[in-house]
């Protein structure tokens, strides 16, 4: 007799190396808890519907729980010849409780079984990711709250542009993560759907109750079409997309952390606990954690592209290609959860070099726009003011000084309306104070922004 659940129709058994190629047990045992949870719900429903006896159902449930316990105690070895987590568990169950174990699969296919497992797994992981995002956001808000008055150069094209609040800069990532969190939250509506009971593709002749298993498994709804239930992998693609975009945001933040920690910038100092050294250069302190996060974006995005390509030509309903949905998702989940934890610890322990930042904006031309705006207050058209300031900046560059160092007489040679109040006007802290538009870098606006962020985190 064949050891395959489908062996009755076959005359020749596959060789071991073919089994190894076909099997998914090396990675889909990640789903053991979800598989057993789904099977317990299915067995409970089968008994309640009179499809199997209560005694058989109780035996099945106790057997499943013992398998789960023993697995987590490293007391079970699964076999590639049994292909996957579903058949390995069923084989072990029958071995433990006898024929009653063979009744578990009544009214069910591996097609709806694996779909149920993946929905349960993805739902739990997305909920975990949301919690990790919120935790990182909370740290960002704490850092920002302590740095409302810390001034730094804002950049465009990686060239110094205008002075901004460090709090305003770092809060940008709060809002990126807020959108990421919202996307994950919204996706739960499409993840939290029960496919169990769809069977292979067309439903089942047994009088099952899909609403009961939906309630037992805490799903928000159930699939209305059995064919769709076993064919749908949209929720996996959506999750991979949301993971990839969140990783892109972490990567952008990581790039800035890397730049800020250079000797050239010295805006921050990373903790030794989140840095590494060199095997040849004794002086080195490298931002490896930030670099790894930046590098892992290619990994998660690759999984997204792989899944899109896997599905693009598949006919309905289940095809073995769908086995490829798991490793990429498992790895992407592991990657983003690790990256979020590392990022939180990395920025929570970094030192912000406030004096260095505040001094930096006095040694550049990031207040040049302020000078142009000053001229506008003297009824000079902005385009004319822009031209005047450009010439002043060029002269400063040629003479090796900055706008705060320009003698008043020199200013007045460029335009007679410039008065002695220009020096106070160009001070970086005053540049920020004048930024009062909603969402701007001014202190009062940043404090308002922080209040909104704290309110969101408390929800």
Swiss-Prot record:
Matching PROSITE patterns: FUMARATE_LYASES (PS00163)
EC main group: lyase
Catalyzed reactions: 2-(N(omega)-L-arginino)succinate = fumarate + L-arginine
Keyword Cytoplasm: yes
InterPro entries, A to Z: Arg_succ_lyase_C (IPR029419), Argininosuccinate_lyase (IPR009049), Fumarase/histidase_N (IPR024083), Fumarate_lyase_CS (IPR020557), Fumarate_lyase_fam (IPR000362), Fumarate_lyase_N (IPR022761), L-Aspartase-like (IPR008948)
One of the record's GO cellular component terms: cytosol
Pathway(s) this gene product operates in, as recorded in its UniProt entry: Amino-acid biosynthesis; L-arginine biosynthesis; L-arginine from L-ornithine and carbamoyl phosphate: step 3/3
Subcellular location as annotated: Cytoplasm
BP GO annotations: arginine biosynthetic process via ornithine; L-arginine biosynthetic process
Paired cysteines (S-S): none
CDD domains: Argininosuccinate_lyase
Transferase keyword on record: no
EC id: 4.3.2.1
Molecular function terms from GO: argininosuccinate lyase activity
Keywords on record: Amino-acid biosynthesis, Arginine biosynthesis, Cytoplasm, Lyase
Domain of life, source organism: Bacteria
HAMAP family registered for this protein in UniProt: Arg_succ_lyase
Protein family according to the UniProt entry: Belongs to the lyase 1 family. Argininosuccinate lyase subfamily.
Protein name: Argininosuccinate lyase
Organism of origin: Staphylococcus aureus (strain MSSA476)
